[in-house]
Amino acid sequence: MSIRLENLSYTPGARKEKHRKGRGHAAGKGKQAGRGQSGQKKRSTVRLGFEGGQNPWFRRVPKRGFRNFNKKEYEIFNLSDLESRYQYGDTVSLESLYLKKVLKKRNLKAKLLAKGDLTKKLTVTTNAFSIAAQKKIEEKGGKIEVR
């Protein structure tokens, strides 16, 4: 007999049939379906945060505060940062502040505060500034532009 495509078959025992669990006693894996005795572990899973009947953490700890989603977050920098990093007559932009490592994040808004002294005329472009910082810059002949 020659071996032909229609004559081929698997060796007996090479392919096992899939057990369909929980489909009656006659199927061999009925009733408890290989999960042992009845109880919590037989069922699906316990919900997230469940502590076995003990009062869970999110109910033990009191509610406190809230998060203001309208809050504007600024990365702050001071006049002392500008004094040490810029020359007379330079233009200070958010990009140059980031490149000179004054600002840690590129896309966050920035606010200029008045800590330190300024001895140079600078043109500063920023998102926000304090009134004291504005006065110190304008005293030296500089300008502040709001982005």
Swiss-Prot record:
Superkingdom to which the source organism belongs: Bacteria
Which GO biological process annotations does it have?
Answer: translation
Is Calcium found in the keyword set? no
Which is an annotated Pfam family here?
Answer: Ribosomal_L27A
Q: Which GO terms describe its cellular component?
A: cytosolic large ribosomal subunit
User: Sorted alphabetically, which keywords does the UniProt record give?
Assistant: Ribonucleoprotein, Ribosomal protein, RNA-binding, rRNA-binding
Locations of Basic residues compositional bias? 16-28
Q: Keyword check for RNA-binding, yes or no.
A: yes
Q: NCBIfam families, from UniProt?
A: rplO_bact (TIGR01071)
- Role played: Binds to the 23S rRNA.
Family assignment from sequence similarity = Belongs to the universal ribosomal protein uL15 family.
Q: How does it assemble?
A: Part of the 50S ribosomal subunit.
This chain belongs to which protein, by name?
Large ribosomal subunit protein uL15
